[in-house]
């Protein structure tokens, strides 16, 4: 007996359409179902995380974004090519620099009381 492949949740149709419009997403007929199911899975993970946030178990809130239709592998492959994603944010910066020494900073203006 074969199990049926998952089907998109019809109660999310309007939210899915709004998300696609917001992020200018368009898919071929073949890809639409796959992207919708991935989006729904990511939405559930986000909602579970945010429930933990509301209970004080995590320190940040999550939301749907332009990457919400990607698998984790697709995100890593397509969106994490930058040095920031690899943990190399600024390897050549000095540990400390006095910005006032080279006049990078100017004195503050007088503020009314």
UniProtKB/Swiss-Prot annotation:
Residue ranges for the region (2 X 3 AA tandem repeats of E-W-K) are 15-20
**One Pfam family named in its UniProt record:** Inhibitor_I29
**InterPro entries attached to this UniProt entry:** Papain-like_cys_pep_sf, Prot_inhib_I29
| Gene Ontology molecular function | cysteine-type endopeptidase inhibitor activity
Question: Repeats (sequence): which ranges?
Answer: 15-17, 18-20
Keywords of the record: Repeat
| Family recorded in the similarity comment | To the propeptide regions of cysteine proteases.
* Record function comment: Not known, expressed in activated T-cell.
Name recorded for this polypeptide: Protein CTLA-2-beta
Which species is the source of this protein? Mus musculus (Mouse)
**Source taxonomy:** Eukaryota, Metazoa, Chordata, Craniata, Vertebrata
Q: Which gene encodes it?
A: Ctla2b
């Amino acid at each position: 007996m074969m199990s049926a492949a998952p089907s998109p949740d019809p109660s999310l149709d309007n939210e899915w359409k709004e998300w696609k419009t917001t992020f200018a997403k368009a898919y071929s007929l073949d890809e639409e179902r796959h992207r919708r199911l991935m989006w729904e899975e990511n939405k559930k993970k986000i909602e579970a995380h945010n429930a933990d946030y509301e209970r004080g178990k995590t320190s940040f809130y999550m939301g749907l974004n332009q990457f919400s239709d990607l698998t984790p592998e697709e995100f890593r492959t397509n969106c994490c090519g930058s040095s920031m994603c690899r943990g190399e944010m600024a390897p050549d910066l000095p540990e400390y620099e006095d910005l006032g020494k080279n006049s990078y900073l100017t004195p503050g203006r007088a503020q009314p009381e």
